[in-house]
Amino acid sequence: MYRVAIIGESLGAQVAALACAASGFHDIHRLQGSRHPNEQPQVYSLGANASRLLRALVPESIEGLGFQPDRRQVRFAKSAYLLAELPLGEFYQQRYGSPLVNFSAPALTAYLEEEIGNPLKNPMSLSDAETSHQLTVLADSERGIKACDDDPSFLIYHASLPDHPLRKANVLWRGKGQYVEQLADNDQVHFRFITRADIPFDPEQWHDSLQDAFAAKMQVGGVSLNGFTASETLFAGRVAYLHSALAPTSHIRVDADNTALEDAWVLSRMMENYEEDIGDGLAAFERFRRPRHRKVAAQLRDHLLKLTEPSVSKRFSQHVGMALQNRLMPELALAQQDWLYEHDVIKGFR
């Protein structure tokens, strides 16, 4: 097999290294990317579409490091009234074939580094990497995770606390054109705050149990709606781009970049199948993954606009529809997430 360079330090970059090694690539050079160590995420939440890849590559990681929440809840910001709830845990695993798992990002990163056993090397320019390797995989945006749009329409904050009364659930708190994602790993409870740039957070409009999180929150980035247009090009020359290199670097959902893990698996299998026909392999990778990128971009944009809806009447309509659907037609509510979690890139690429 030929020489492969993987640029980046994200989870997608690590999975790319593991997947390429599993596909028979042994001359793999891992290069530091643009992310500063202090800018790495604090938590990963892997749905079945991503956790099944870890189970295939490093099965011990889920049992040893992962925290499996037992339900997903939607609650009102101030009253904490339970608007909707769907089961996770064993029910979710039986439906999709793999669990939804939350990880401490530093712990999972350190564990995978040991499993990879191939230390990161000093940064190299993309052009130099392409010159000295037959295949280059760009896994991180060259702008860095804190890079925002010049005029971001939405701001993103993060906080971590030792505990919370609802730590066993993944909770979406819905406010007035704002929302908070809450999820726990084995050690901490994490909160991701998203708001329109012109609507600052008012802690008094949120539940008492969130006050410590509001006091601890720090801005981690911002995004514009322009960032939710899927790239039509997933490779250039002999450089392949994972989703994490193309999407907004500040994520409006904590699991927004799990698509990069799917890309890493498919790319490794495509290049194994096409052997020395690198150009044909990259073209096949692009054809296979481009529809998924389009779907994810459209869904993320819809997710952001829906949860930051400024109109009171439109939010009320959303709340009524969500409550009725989850209580009277839970199967329909589950079916609406199947597109994300049923997606199994392992099939056909073993």
Range-by-range predicted roles:
Residues 64-66, 206-224, 278-284, 296-297:
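Acidic/histidine metal-binding catalytic segments
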Residues 6-23, 224-306:
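Conserved mid-domain beta->alpha element of the FAD-binding
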Residues 2-4, 47-166, 198-200, 346-350:
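Conserved N-terminal helical subregion
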Residues 4-6, 28:
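Conserved hydrophobic helix-helix packing surfaces used for dimerization/oligomerization
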Residues 158, 178-181, 246-247:
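Histidine-centered metal-chelating micro-motifs
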Residues 21-42:
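Glycine-rich FAD pyrophosphate-binding loop
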Residues 84-86, 91-96, 104, 162-230:
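Conserved FAD/dinucleotide-binding core of flavoprotein oxidoreductases
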Residues 1-2, 63-64, 269-350:
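C-terminal helical "tail/cap" subdomain of flavin- and related membrane-associated enzymes
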